[in-house]
Amino acid sequence: MEQPKYKRVVLKLSGEALAGKQGFGIQPAVIQSIAKQVKEVVELGVEVAIVVGGGNIWRGKTGSEMGMDRATADYMGMLATVMNALALQDSLEQLGVETRVQTSIEMRQVAEPYIRRRAIRHLEKKRVVIFAAGTGNPYFSTDTTAALRAAEIEADVILMAKNNVDGVYSADPNVDANAVKYDELSYLDVIKQGLGVMDSTASSLCMDNNIPLIVFSIMEEGNIKRAVLGENIGTIVRGK
């Protein structure tokens, strides 16, 4: 059996990753593909926690740019992440993968409230835990949620799955043909150069807690497993 490099991981899925090429909403084929990839990793004995974004349904930033109260717009974004989390839970459980959704905002009829010790216990029992509703606070991104939860549950790595790029580039490769892909970066490089991997709050949290980050494409099947096995895919960000 292949030996994974990481024992406990946080998989960060953007809302856009769940929308696939249609760019909006939840695309069933995409979410099923992601669920299959997660199952492969669980079968290696790896403990998997997932943080989902909500940008495929609603973006708080967009709402505030339209003149909406920023906090209200962000709370709407948090609710969007819960919808994504429930859809992903359903896909995983259809494949026989035990899954729990924990939300930072209490909604006991649909999910457990986020309790750190309970989340860790689920992971130890090889259940997948999906963290939804961000940090529960406006003004914080789901990237920051991933960094925070990774620190709390003592994850070995954050796997940042992208649907439009296969790593970190010097510029947007979809726009600039001369963009250079990086194999490895430090968090200070990311912050100083404004590379847009994750926001500065999330980057600082990862740097201060020494949590490595792997940025890779979710669109190629099997990439989550490859990342967990330590294969060189995408870009690794670590250290100062």
Curated annotation (Swiss-Prot):
Binding positions (ATP): 12-15, 55, 59, 163, 169, 172
Organism, scientific name: Geobacillus kaustophilus (strain HTA426)
Gene3D superfamilies: Acetylglutamate kinase-like
Assembly and binders: Homohexamer.
Entry-linked Pfam families: AA_kinase
Record keywords: Allosteric enzyme, ATP-binding, Cytoplasm, Kinase, Nucleotide-binding, Pyrimidine biosynthesis, Transferase
Binding residue positions for UMP: 54, 74, 135-142
Record region (Involved in allosteric activation by GTP): 20-25
Protein EC: 2.7.4.22
Compartmental location: Cytoplasm
GO CC annotation, single: cytoplasm
Annotated function: Catalyzes the reversible phosphorylation of UMP to UDP.
Protein name: Uridylate kinase
Classification via InterPro entries: AceGlu_kinase-like_sf (IPR036393), Asp/Glu/Uridylate_kinase (IPR001048), Uridylate_kinase (IPR011817), Uridylate_kinase_bac (IPR015963)
Pathway: Pyrimidine metabolism; CTP biosynthesis via de novo pathway; UDP from UMP (UMPK route): step 1/1
Alphabetized GO MF terms: ATP binding; UMP kinase activity
